[in-house]
């Protein structure tokens, strides 16, 4: 009963956070005459994204003299439609989304984590007898979305390279992937290193990593070409300044951006073009 009460309280608190964030005029400097849209790829639930990003954007916005409207699409495909139409002004997106956004709308990456590189993983239940990727042939594999970079595109490309046919089942979020494997709805699932690390111990303990991909520069914050260089620079400086105090470091840890660094498309994301992942893309609504 106590556990149920705690769960209900947590859900209620998250709902309040979502509602308050959604109803706020903007996050950051309230006197700013310009409100920038800030979209976050929905790898997690909207409640979790609002809980972690809202306080960070509030502080960064105040420091930088900027104000943001935090937006979270219901699904990754919906997020992609908005991105490839050029709607978000600031956006936190996966590395291959950064490639597409640069090619389609000239978005420029601004900063990303410098230490925790991104890897795609395939997980199975901890008690699964499966030892090799070959054993997944013809099986249902949970993936968050068709165009999730490390959790889907890299996994499907790796399986295709090995000539292992799988049945991908798209379940919207990384959290859903891990739980579908635990619940035996799929024999394996695709995720990324840090979303598994962020799961509660009860989930992590029931899973085993079967495969891990090469490491890549992780998700960046990128900006639409309409965002002035001065606004980009103020945002970057404010984000880097968060590393200087404990509260700021906790905010960065919450979004898996503990050691932010300035990044460029040419150096950090253009090399992904050579992976030729476009053959695995599924784009809708364009």
Residue ranges and their predicted role:
Residues 77-91, 104-105, 134, 175-190, ...:
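Short helices/loops that flank or line small-molecule/ion binding pockets
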Residues 9-20:
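Bacterial N-terminal signal peptides
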Residues 33-43, 115-124, 202-243, 253-275:
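Periplasmic-binding protein-like
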Residues 1-5:
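N-terminal secretory signal peptides that target proteins for export/translocation
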Residues 26-95:
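Extracytoplasmic small-molecule ligand-binding "clamshell" domains
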Residues 100-124:
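Glycine/small-residue-rich loop that forms an oxyanion/phosphate-binding "nest" at active or ligand-binding sites
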Residues 34-43, 49, 134-151:
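Short loop->beta-strand "edge-of-pocket" segments that line small-molecule binding or catalytic clefts
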Residues 128, 139-230, 237:
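Pocket-lining segment of extracytoplasmic ligand-binding domains
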């Amino acid at each position: 009963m106590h556990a149920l009460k705690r769960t209900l309280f947590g859900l209620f608190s998250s709902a309040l956070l979502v509602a308050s964030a959604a109803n706020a005029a903007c996050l950051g400097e309230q006197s700013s005459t310009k409100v920038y849209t800030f979209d976050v790829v929905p790898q997690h639930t909207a409640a979790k994204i609002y809980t972690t990003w809202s306080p960070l954007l509030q502080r960064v916005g105040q420091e930088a003299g900027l104000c943001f409207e935090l937006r979270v699409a219901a699904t990754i495909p919906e997020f992609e439609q908005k991105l490839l139409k050029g709607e978000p002004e600031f956006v936190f997106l996966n590395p291959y989304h950064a490639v597409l956004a640069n090619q389609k709308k000239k978005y420029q990456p601004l900063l990303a984590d410098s230490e925790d590189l991104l890897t795609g993983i395939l997980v199975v239940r901890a008690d699964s007898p499966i030892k090799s990727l070959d054993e997944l042939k013809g099986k249902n594999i949970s993936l968050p979305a068709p165009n999730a970079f490390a959790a889907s595109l890299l996994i499907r490309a790796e399986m295709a390279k090995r000539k292992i046919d799988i049945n991908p089942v798209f379940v919207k979020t990384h959290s859903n992937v891990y739980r579908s494997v635990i619940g035996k709805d799929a024999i394996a699932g695709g995720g990324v290193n840090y979303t598994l690390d962020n799961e509660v111990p009860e989930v992590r303990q029931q899973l085993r990593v079967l495969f891990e991909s090469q490491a890549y520069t992780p998700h960046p914050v990128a900006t639409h070409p309409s965002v002035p260089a001065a606004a980009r620079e103020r945002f970057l400086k404010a984000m880097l300044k968060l590393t200087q105090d404990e509260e700021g470091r906790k905010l960065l840890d919450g979004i898996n951006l503990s050691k932010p660094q300035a990044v460029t498309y040419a150096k950090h994301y253009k090399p992904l073009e050579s992976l030729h992942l476009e053959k695995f893309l599924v784009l809708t609504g364009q």
